Amino acid sequence: MPHKPTWENPEIDEKELLDWIRHSVQTSSNVYSHGYQGRVYLYTGKGGRKLIIKTPTGRGLMRYVRTKMLEREFKAYSKLPPMDGIPRCIGFLDGLYLVLEFVEGVPIYKAEIKDHKFFFDSFLALIKKIHAEGVAHTDLKKKDNVLVIDGKKPCIIDFGVSVIKKKGFSPLNAYLYNTSRTFDFNAWVKLKYDGKYEEMSEEDSKYYHRMLIEEIARCIREPYLSIKIALLGRK
């Protein structure tokens, strides 16, 4: 089970923050964004320190699943030591609210990257670092999950579907973890070359391993997008 969070900033009172979160949820105020896990709120404390609070939404099974995803994300952050390119996790409040340090970054699909080679070399190194700690992200192809800081530094967010490597003998976990690692490297190649795999260098090709499950997803996605575009055009 997640451990009780500790607060690094003495200006942030746990009860005060929890009251703020509950009020924000009840009044739908201070909403920063929405995601597949639920709503994201932006808290600004004394001294201007900003925190992101991720909360589950929905009812019944959907709320349970989203809460479990937030719990998994908390476990992933807890597994990782402090490192540049990963948001600092403050804690998991009341078994519902994931509290993270706010990161001033731009999603990669919107960002202007000043030094393409430096950024993607740093991004690759960051992926290798989290893998070395036994965490695979799994969902880096979703461009919202990769931020660009100051036009040059990568930051990985949203570990809700991550896979954490277990100790000891666990064949299923080992398979899932290794598959997720492959997903991460494939995503790095896709983002670096913007999906133009024919331009991939020989050096980078060693990080790309086409997987059947990705091919199936692509086959489903392309017709779906074509239908969606056609329907939007009729409006």
What is each model feature region?
Residues 1-31, 228-234:
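Juxta-kinase regulatory segment immediately upstream of eukaryotic protein kinase catalytic domains
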Residues 24-78:
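ATP-binding glycine-rich loop module of kinase domains
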Residues 42-48, 101-102, 149-150:
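Active-site beta-strand termini and strand-to-loop segments that position acidic
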Residues 66-122:
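Conserved structural core of kinase catalytic domains
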Residues 125-129:
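Conserved hydrophobic core/spine positions of the Hanks-type protein kinase catalytic domain
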Residues 132-149:
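Catalytic-loop of the protein kinase fold
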Residues 149-235:
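C-lobe/activation-segment region of protein kinase-like
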